[in-house]
């Protein structure tokens, strides 16, 4: 059996591809592999950006593997580090993750996409949370989706399970950009290369600030930032990269980021 998760690196970018028959559904073993992959990415100082995509032209990911569940995988089983799909609960993921959705993205697959920082979609991609139709709750999406798109659109998706095509998902802000299917991965790499050329310490600080602010009142969050109470912000202030950014601007040249 081939590996369900394939990876390749180029420069500072890691590409992660879900490749499971028949629709890239995720079982416990695959989730644990994804967790290990993203944890290694998080902890590798040479890697700055990740792209998550899937091998099929029809399916990105439908979420939980129902066949595996019927064969004995427990819904509350060991998903591995990072929870389902390796990203949703991975602590301190302070590097940008791009999701390149190349087909049907629903249920837990959409929850994984929502755990990424930027979502690009092929023009034929579709999105849904169909759990309601099987009498279950899209647990992580119930928390995340109303924070990502207008509340009433999120509630319609959660309450009815209706599908959005790529253009509508883009219109509501769920998707950053829609591309022809043949261009999706080249556009994802273009975005990844752009981010990989940027300042990693600033990215880390931005991601921690955003995470912290989601559960804090604005003033409390602002005080935590300005008081340098967040580890990544404290590391950023006074770093070589921060000074390099100032110097490069003053000298009208491109900065050289070192992550120090």
Label the model's feature ranges.
Residues 1-11, 44-45, 57, 161, ...:
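C-terminal alpha-helix plus adjacent terminal tail
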């Amino acid at each position: 059996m081939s590996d369900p998760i394939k990876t390749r690196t180029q420069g500072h970018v890691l590409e992660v591809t879900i490749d499971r028959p028949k629709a890239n559904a995720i079982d416990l073993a695959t989730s644990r592999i994804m967790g290990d992959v993203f944890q290694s990415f998080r902890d590798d100082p040479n890697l700055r950006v990740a792209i998550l995509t899937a091998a099929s032209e029809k399916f990105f990911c439908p979420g939980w593997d129902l066949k595996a569940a019927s064969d004995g995988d427990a819904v509350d089983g060991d998903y591995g580090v990072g929870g389902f799909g390796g990203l949703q609960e991975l602590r301190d993921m302070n590097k940008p993750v791009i999701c390149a959705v190349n087909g049907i993205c629903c249920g837990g697959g959409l929850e994984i996409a929502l755990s990424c920082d930027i979502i690009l979609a092929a023009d034929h991609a579709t999105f849904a949370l169909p759990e309601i139709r099987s009498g279950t709750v899209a647990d992580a999406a119930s928390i995340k989706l109303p924070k990502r798109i207008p509340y009433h659109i999120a509630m319609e998706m959660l309450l009815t399970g209706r599908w959005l095509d790529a253009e509508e998902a883009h219109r509501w802000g769920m998707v950053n950009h829609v591309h022809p299917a043949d261009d999706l991965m080249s556009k994802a790499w273009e975005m990844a290369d752009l981010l990989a050329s940027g300042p990693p310490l600033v990215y880390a600080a931005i991601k921690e600030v955003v995470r912290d602010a989601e559960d804090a009142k604005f003033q409390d969050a602002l005080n935590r930032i300005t008081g340098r109470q967040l580890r990544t912000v404290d590391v950023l202030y006074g770093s070589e990269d921060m000074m390099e950014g100032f110097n490069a601007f003053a000298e009208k040249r491109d900065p050289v980021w070192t992550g120090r």
